[in-house]
């Protein structure tokens, strides 16, 4: 059977009739199942007609069961009976007679009545409803009668029946407003007033709402529909119907050439004749190219004449980008629409909107939303969710927080789960006892089952009562938790563990980075400021430039910070600036310009920060990059934002930016004196720092340096630091060996010798790594290959009499 012309509700009726057949255990779908489907659908004209005749689902089900009984589960695929097929064919014929281009629930009911001999007809007669009376009721609801049925819906009627094609393709916003299905529209009175002004013009009376996604363009059209229902519009717009047309629905199912144009022409003719329709086309840019196959004209060109003459009142809605990309290119279409800018609401307006919607979300989630939660949703979404717009993102926060709180409160208690498990076990044991014919045991288990079932029912009812009495509350903390889940930025209140970790951050960092207290303190203070909520919200958490000779821990401190913040040292965004030495390579940071290879891939820096807005950004060896790179970084350091090649603004306000550089390393090498008294060392460090800063000023522009929070000069490593660093490096080696079930330890003398061998003030800690490779790793690899070391063995390395490294027995 062909269901192409059947409306969504009509198709739902047929699906429900199949469900009824399965429920009753019947192998075929008969007229009685279609009747049950019509009543169960509940919203169509047929359901309303049957309800007005006093027919309820339970009554019809009872009568059907009485007439044909209940079977077992159907054993084969379910098919329509010949009578049911005839009803479907007659419904199409009824639609044709009434001049409707669609088949709705009312036509199915008319077909059912016309067939007149099936089980459905008997059910209706038994319930005291004559078929003729049922038919008259349907036609009355359709705004028609028997004498009008053959006239194919004349234009004189101002009812819904005069626009059958439009009704099948569009949704009536005024009906939704009347039924209270539209959310209240708050703070858009200026935009609605401007829309009314444009609609009241003689020609070109077509407003188009332009604004960013999520600012409330569709809400303006819904607000107009609500005002029409409340009679708060001028006389010119009284009794108008606002119909929202989805171009996808208009195009859907148009298989043959000319079908789309015919459908659209019918819609336009119906609108012209009805005279009381305001068409709302959301995503207006979909008009361009819609239905425009090879040689055919698209929807926008079909609508242009009517739009210009004022025969068609149309409200459009589209985003700024799509308006520019599609509508502005077609000047003839653009001049027929009057643009109305819908701006993003302010924080105060967003709070008003959320307060207006609060009742709807409280009723849906069965929770109470506090004033603090409303304010937090507006302020936190504005601050942390930067790629979307108010009020949409704030509403989404409230919605998800409500969902989260409700699900949390509806978690089944453990004692209830335990009772359900016990009941299942007893039921299985009883079935097993019956199978093995142990009837006494089965009787005893049946009593236990009954007892458990009663206990379960009582416990479940008590839990449900308790749930119904106490409404869960959506608090500021719940909103903050959702923001953290979305963005990865921790905005919830500090826990005791986190507070302790932040206060002891220096100690944690000192365990990884030896001998650089100034750098560690500066970074720790920046993180504490941010987490306590005292940092400047318009700038990054902190921006640092680490200077010093090679191998003193500049990059290591960035890794350690990432581990403290995210429990993973690889969680930082690392950009090796030596890759950006050529001028043309700088575009890779923000993405290639249009027309170049890699435009669709996005920037290497911007894309990573968009995905992880709360992160440590390490720009390693920054002096190796081309000077143009620093121009890109200016607005990142000052305003915490950067625009990528596609025009998207990337938010850097929740990042820690660390740049490392070897500028002035030669000065450090020349001016490092060992063995002076403490006072002299401090004075020496200050002199050396000032010289390095001078070198830095020569290498970088003042506007770049002026935007950096702190410039930190790392100390050269002292001999006393070496043992601690060797211990750290050996711990890393121990971790690698542990994976092979080997346990390594070194004697103090062995550690001391590595520290002495690897000490070089000019090269920092890296020579120690080479010393460990040469003396420890090479020795272990030889012993492993020789088979002298077995798995699960404790391996101790020390020195022999000649001072050589050996594996001790």
From Swiss-Prot:
<comment type="similarity">
    <text>Belongs to the ClpA/ClpB family.</text>
</comment>
<keyword id="KW-0067">ATP-binding</keyword>
<dbReference type="Pfam" id="PF00004">
    <property type="entry name" value="AAA"/>
</dbReference>
<dbReference type="InterPro" id="IPR027417">
    <property type="entry name" value="P-loop_NTPase"/>
</dbReference>
<feature type="compositionally biased region" description="Low complexity">
    <location>
        <begin position="147"/>
        <end position="162"/>
    </location>
</feature>
<keyword id="KW-0963">Cytoplasm</keyword>
<dbReference type="InterPro" id="IPR019489">
    <property type="entry name" value="Clp_ATPase_C"/>
</dbReference>
<feature type="binding site">
    <location>
        <begin position="211"/>
        <end position="218"/>
    </location>
    <ligand>
        <name>ATP 1</name>
    </ligand>
</feature>
<feature type="region of interest" description="NBD2">
    <location>
        <begin position="498"/>
        <end position="716"/>
    </location>
</feature>
<dbReference type="InterPro" id="IPR003959">
    <property type="entry name" value="ATPase_AAA_core"/>
</dbReference>
<dbReference type="InterPro" id="IPR036628">
    <property type="entry name" value="Clp_N_dom_sf"/>
</dbReference>
<dbReference type="InterPro" id="IPR003593">
    <property type="entry name" value="AAA+_ATPase"/>
</dbReference>
<feature type="binding site">
    <location>
        <begin position="548"/>
        <end position="555"/>
    </location>
    <ligand>
        <name>ATP 2</name>
    </ligand>
</feature>
<keyword id="KW-0547">Nucleotide-binding</keyword>
<feature type="coiled-coil region">
    <location>
        <begin position="395"/>
        <end position="471"/>
    </location>
</feature>
<dbReference type="GO" id="GO:0016887">
    <property type="term" value="F:ATP hydrolysis activity"/>
</dbReference>
<dbReference type="InterPro" id="IPR018368">
    <property type="entry name" value="ClpA/B_CS1"/>
</dbReference>
<dbReference type="Pfam" id="PF17871">
    <property type="entry name" value="AAA_lid_9"/>
</dbReference>
<feature type="region of interest" description="Repeat 1">
    <location>
        <begin position="6"/>
        <end position="71"/>
    </location>
</feature>
<dbReference type="InterPro" id="IPR001943">
    <property type="entry name" value="UVR_dom"/>
</dbReference>
<feature type="region of interest" description="Linker">
    <location>
        <begin position="345"/>
        <end position="488"/>
    </location>
</feature>
<feature type="domain" description="Clp R">
    <location>
        <begin position="3"/>
        <end position="144"/>
    </location>
</feature>
<comment type="function">
    <text>Part of a stress-induced multi-chaperone system, it is involved in the recovery of the cell from heat-induced damage, in cooperation with DnaK, DnaJ and GrpE. Acts before DnaK, in the processing of protein aggregates. Protein binding stimulates the ATPase activity; ATP hydrolysis unfolds the denatured protein aggregates, which probably helps expose new hydrophobic binding sites on the surface of ClpB-bound aggregates, contributing to the solubilization and refolding of denatured protein aggregates by DnaK.</text>
</comment>
<protein>
    <recommendedName>
        <fullName>Chaperone protein ClpB</fullName>
    </recommendedName>
</protein>
<dbReference type="InterPro" id="IPR050130">
    <property type="entry name" value="ClpA_ClpB"/>
</dbReference>
<dbReference type="InterPro" id="IPR041546">
    <property type="entry name" value="ClpA/ClpB_AAA_lid"/>
</dbReference>
<feature type="region of interest" description="Repeat 2">
    <location>
        <begin position="80"/>
        <end position="144"/>
    </location>
</feature>
<dbReference type="GO" id="GO:0005524">
    <property type="term" value="F:ATP binding"/>
</dbReference>
<feature type="domain" description="UVR">
    <location>
        <begin position="420"/>
        <end position="455"/>
    </location>
</feature>
<dbReference type="Pfam" id="PF07724">
    <property type="entry name" value="AAA_2"/>
</dbReference>
<dbReference type="GO" id="GO:0005737">
    <property type="term" value="C:cytoplasm"/>
</dbReference>
<dbReference type="Pfam" id="PF02861">
    <property type="entry name" value="Clp_N"/>
</dbReference>
<feature type="region of interest" description="C-terminal">
    <location>
        <begin position="717"/>
        <end position="809"/>
    </location>
</feature>
<keyword id="KW-0346">Stress response</keyword>
<keyword id="KW-0143">Chaperone</keyword>
<keyword id="KW-0677">Repeat</keyword>
<keyword id="KW-0175">Coiled coil</keyword>
<dbReference type="InterPro" id="IPR001270">
    <property type="entry name" value="ClpA/B"/>
</dbReference>
<dbReference type="InterPro" id="IPR028299">
    <property type="entry name" value="ClpA/B_CS2"/>
</dbReference>
<dbReference type="Pfam" id="PF10431">
    <property type="entry name" value="ClpB_D2-small"/>
</dbReference>
<feature type="region of interest" description="Disordered">
    <location>
        <begin position="145"/>
        <end position="165"/>
    </location>
</feature>
<feature type="region of interest" description="NBD1">
    <location>
        <begin position="163"/>
        <end position="344"/>
    </location>
</feature>
